[in-house]
Amino acid sequence: TFDTGGISIKPAPDMEKMKYDMCGAAAVIGAMQAIARLKPSVAVMGVIPTVENMPGGKAQRPGDIVKSLSGKTIEILNTDAEGRLILADAITYAKQLGATHLVDAATLTGAVVVALGHHFTGVFTNNDEFLARWNEAAKNSGEKMWHMPVNDQYREQLKTVYADIGNIGGRDGGACTAAAFLREFVEDTPWIHLDIAGTAWLDDSKPWMPKGPTAIPIASFVRLAQDWK
């Protein structure tokens, strides 16, 4: 759904493109539809958290403390970092449902676009073996991915006095601190995080893709499920 940034409102230029901020959810729906038809041997579930981030009298405010589904508290330092809040609860919920491996996809940060442009999806993980499986699926699907760090140093940037974790980590390494935030809720479950903010849609046509939504990373999702053993 639409993301204005809430009380921490986005600049007006290009805000109309925030209709694309649901591309991660759309990718999960598309992948689940294909997986249901192909019937691979592995059980796959899709969890899709949705929210509209709008300013208003009941809007979330900077300085609010919220309690996540996991029980951990989060200090809201910027209301435009709302996607990671709902992803955190979706991750916890998927674990409660019995997920043994997790892959999330989200147009999570502008920082990943600064780092990688529109050519590669940023990939973050806590498990090298799972990353190897994912990379093979992405390679066979023709979708370009780039491994990014999510070390403990990025978690340090999320420390806050009033809650277990803050929802932003400052200017530096924004894509990495966003991934570190999610890792807090993943814990030890093998996990892949895909920041598709730069690859989910294109403003201009490329030799390999027309402008508009790209459907990345649906093909990789489906290939991973098909090849799972």
PLM regions with names:
Residues 1-229:
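A generic structural signal for tightly packed, nonpolar segments enriched in small/aliphatic residues
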